[in-house]
């Protein structure tokens, strides 16, 4: 095709090699307003399309952007494992990729846009061991850039791994085994106040790797502390600039027809001025008056009263004809704008926050363990009005989650689920399958805890952790981290270190001509909505285990980010102190939890342990009540909630692996496994049976005549026997021992 255009660039990782990024347009999906094919080293291939509705969406007071990621099984040379052999609902990995794309993309569109915009990223091909999420951010940005929509991109997204002290861009799965930290950053190029181009960080998603603890404590790797994270974000800026330049080069080769959809502001200037006159002075009295009052969570009710009175007055103005009827829908937005201005000004000028706290104050903390009977572990963590219940369930490793997606990871033994019922905010709403937000929050909490989990060898259990958000007013995800630490310890999980999390906020603005940045610790839901940043940080007392940053600013100065990380560390240590006062070491495992024992057998003995059609292993499970799973390397996991069942199963497994070879004269308490007209077959040890002839059975009843051996012995009955003879073929002849 003659009109195909492309642009490519090289990401230089020094001694770790290079990665080639290529964007192409004009060949595929030509009906979409914007479509781009993105390549990573020529083998991983994504198609991103951006489409826009022709008319504004009716009765919509928000920007209707939808981001979807379509994973195709053929991309990895697979056929779907479902009944219909067709892709179904998106995988968790695809949903998380959608969130990674949406978070930097959404604030880059013009405010007031009401036309539906849909971005679909389809994974067409993926090389083994590759991740596609960071490439998808760039592909979505590029297709939106060439669509002609009002968009302040391009946006560059890069994934970095800290390996041997170097930040490596676009790492492969195999690289992460030697990495301490995994960091995904998105940003865009903007012109700063000095007129120079700079990189605005818009989104950060990061975690310590599963191998981080061993690398740090056994191999001397650098701890991912606050300073190291800052270095990583700064390193990302170089790669983001390169990725943005490639996208801009592609756009410069096209004759773009810019689409200018109508913009619908949330409120008119006249409505804003009227509402401001009604409420501003009263709101200032409320929030400036909080300066000396200390923490007062009920102070927000005063602003609710002000809002209701203002609405009544505005409604009267509509009835009098000063404003038209449609203006009523503008009131909530205008009120929020005035409230936002008042709250931000109060903070910037040194007054108290919305609830009366100081800038670095944490809301009252409370924690308790063992709150739910019969479960394996449970805890409640409360911070202000945010309350989270954590519940832990343990099981055998065969219950670990099997992952059927394009991700290189095929299974995981730690599963974290997060639930956000509508009553947590005092509302009525739908319940059912988890929404994207719930999946994202659960995954963030999961990543915060994975680095401190014991190894499979030290703790051979699958772990399911559930976080129930019972009350929400700011950062239930970080509350989930704290509740989970308590719950896991209560369940007897030997965590390498306790983990706590905190959400930080930021207010920025000019005061007397000077630009000020004020960091807020432990932000409430309102401060999250009215502020400039949502910065969640989780970690141990030594290093950061997970981090998530979203900002509405063009960029966060390095010193502001450094200050936020320092305040987050102080808050994290304070919360950890509360957690360790409640529980500082693993409790005894619950009597209801399975006890899992690990036994190692030679690989060549696996078939013997399983037996023909599973006969041997099933007989052990039936007889002992224990569950048994066998790994390919000969590791056998035996689990039961009753210790004697596990011990009996271990003994039976060992008798197969290291069998006691029957010899003439040896005695066994055997089990009748089959009755025949000529006698009974007795199982001596797993895999070794002998024949107790009917003539010997008659001796057990003083020689009387038997119509059937069933008159004396039944299947499953225990009988003491002695080996009397072993023939040339190894067959065992038995006699009963009185």
Swiss-Prot record:
Its cofactor is Mg(2+). Its main location: cytoplasm. CDD domains: KH-I_PNPase, RNase_PH_PNPase_2. Residues 665-737 form the S1 motif domain. SUPFAM superfamilies: Eukaryotic type KH-domain (KH-domain type I), Polynucleotide phosphorylase/guanosine pentaphosphate synthase (PNPase/GPSI), domain 3, Ribonuclease PH domain 2-like, Ribosomal protein S5 domain 2-like. It catalyses: RNA(n+1) + phosphate = RNA(n) + a ribonucleoside 5'-diphosphate. InterPro entries: ExoRNase_PH_dom1, ExoRNase_PH_dom2, ExoRNase_PH_dom2_sf, GPSI/PNP, KH_dom, KH_dom_type_1, KH_dom_type_1_sf, NA-bd_OB-fold. One of its GO terms (biological process) is RNA processing. One of its GO terms (molecular function) is 3'-5'-RNA exonuclease activity. Belongs to the polyribonucleotide nucleotidyltransferase family. Involved in mRNA degradation. Catalyzes the phosphorolysis of single-stranded polyribonucleotides processively in the 3'- to 5'-direction. This is Polyribonucleotide nucleotidyltransferase. The gene is pnp.
